[in-house]
């Protein structure tokens, strides 16, 4: 995992716009968001975390990751039954969303690498075509 390429620019902009953020940024100079550069993983985590507490999301995600044998990928998720995903603590809608994401990734209907070439609105529109993913995902 590494710091996102936009991190330093974002800190600078936030520091100029908000005094509280400036103090926090200066207090935590070593702190940073990290990226895995894995869109599939991140979208699964986003779907799992929707409308539940952080503690619940962490618990469900841990079970989900174990079901994937430690490697969350479209191929591994696609092999899992809906029942296995439900046993992880996922709702029927979240199971459908994650299975849909896996299938569209495998079939290349969803191409994660395109997102980096899009502006924010284009990326939001593209991602919103996926079940369980919207503007705030």
Predicted regions and their residues:
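Structural motif
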Residues: 33-41, 89-93
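Intrinsically disordered, low-complexity, charged terminal extensions of DNA damage-control enzymes
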Residues: 1-38
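Alpha-helical ds-nucleic-acid-binding substructure associated with the helix-hairpin-helix region
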Residues: 52-53, 57-131
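Short acidic alpha-helix initiation/capping motifs at coil-to-helix transition points
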Residues: 1-4, 37-40, 75-78, 118
């Amino acid at each position: 995992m590494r710091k996102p390429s936009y991190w330093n620019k974002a800190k600078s902009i936030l520091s100029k716009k908000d005094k509280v953020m400036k103090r926090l940024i200066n207090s935590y100079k070593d702190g940073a968001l990290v990226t895995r550069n894995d869109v599939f993983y991140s979208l699964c985590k986003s779907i799992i975390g929707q409308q539940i507490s952080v503690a619940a999301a962490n618990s469900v995600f841990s079970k989900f990751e174990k079901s994937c044998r430690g490697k969350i990928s479209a191929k591994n998720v696609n092999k899992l039954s809906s029942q296995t995903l439900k046993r992880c603590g996922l709702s029927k809608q979240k199971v459908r969303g994650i299975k849909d994401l896996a299938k569209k990734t495998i079939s290349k209907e969803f191409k994660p690498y395109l997102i980096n070439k899009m502006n924010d609105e284009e990326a939001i529109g593209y991602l919103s075509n996926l079940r369980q993913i919207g503007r705030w995902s």
